[in-house]
Amino acid sequence: MCIRDRSKPEKDPRDIAAAGKAKKSGYPACALCMENEGYAGHLTHPARQNHRIIPLILDGESYYLQYSPYVYYNEHCIILNEKHIPMVINGGTFRKLLDFVRQFPHYTAGSNADLPIVGGSILSHDHFQGGGYEFPMVRAPYEKYFEIPGAENVEAGIIRWPLSTIRLRSESAGDLARAAERVLTAWRSYDDPACFIYHETEGKSHNTITPIARMREGKFELDLVLRNNITTKEYPLGYFHPHPEYHHIKKENIGLIEVMGLAVLPARLKQEMAELEDRILCGQDLRESERTKAHADWAESWIAARGINPAQGTKGTGGNGGADPGGSLLRKRLHGAVQEEIGIVFAKVLECAGVFKYTKKGREGFDRFLDSLR
């Protein structure tokens, strides 16, 4: 997994949902509107004097391409609708994404889901994200293949990935979009109580898809990630959302970028992890600091297992049998361990977001959904 700190503030999923419903009266209406180009900004809106957008036509509709001010990966770009309209996932979404990678075959392009909790941080303006970066998800192999009746020109299968993902491939963008729309239609109304999947409760829809498009070996490819945003008393931020035991690392929505395997983590972790490493090396109680107390149980669960012994480091052995008078080798080992353990937490967070778990019950549930497509 890839780890990145982020420069944007950490957001509560409930605040994101509320922002998506709020009526906008300011100018520009949101941070993605085309009116941001060259805008000087004001007290509550960032300046965008150097901002430029490039017009595109996707499936007959007007869009604009811009490069993101928050560069999470190589050539990170945003493809925004000319109009300030809400995010939506439908057949048109698939056609537009495929049209984009047809025009830019060296780029990946995807869309956040159109529902709170499983969507991104901006639900109020229709947009996609793309770029020239190979995400870990691209390398995920097929786990099994299946057939979609009437879509003989489309290769279909599920891939080995923490989130439940169907991969479709075809030389025909039209055939691929139609097959994807069939999967979306089936998923929108799908229930499986055994896997706690309900498409609707109290009049609220829960099932949607995070789609990702790319060109590979001369074929169009679509990854369809099955999402569900149901909440419970035990999990008020989302049942298929990072569970509370991981919130000290990742509490926000699992959006498009995370779905593809790149961890977008809160900026606070930089200082928190630096202090955590210092306190571990000095033998100080992690629970005595505001910055590290939330990480105490987590750190204590792996320090001994990784053979990290601060006392040995201060005595000059570094815990590895060699001279380490300043403890620099131990510090380096500890820093590497922290990075690896954050990656493990991120993988667990992705597993939380998977609707069909990697258990016997989860795999049987995935098979039942595939059967519903036949």
Where are these regions (language model features)?
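Histidine-centered divalent-metal-coordination microenvironment in nucleic-acid enzymes
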Residues: 76, 81, 118-135, 225
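Intrinsically disordered, low-complexity linker/loop segments enriched in Gly/Pro
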Residues: 82-104
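Catalytic or ion-translocation cores adjacent to nucleophile or general acid/base/metal-coordination motifs
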Residues: 92, 101-121, 130-191
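SsDNA-processing nucleotidyl-transfer enzymes
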Residues: 17, 23-76
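Short, small-residue-biased leader/transition segments that mark boundaries at the very start
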Residues: 1-3
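Residues forming anionic-ligand binding surfaces in small-molecule and nucleic-acid pockets
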Residues: 68-83, 158-162
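Beta-rich nucleic-acid/ligand-interaction surfaces
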Residues: 116-124, 201-208
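C-terminal accessory/tail domains of diverse enzymes
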Residues: 157-374
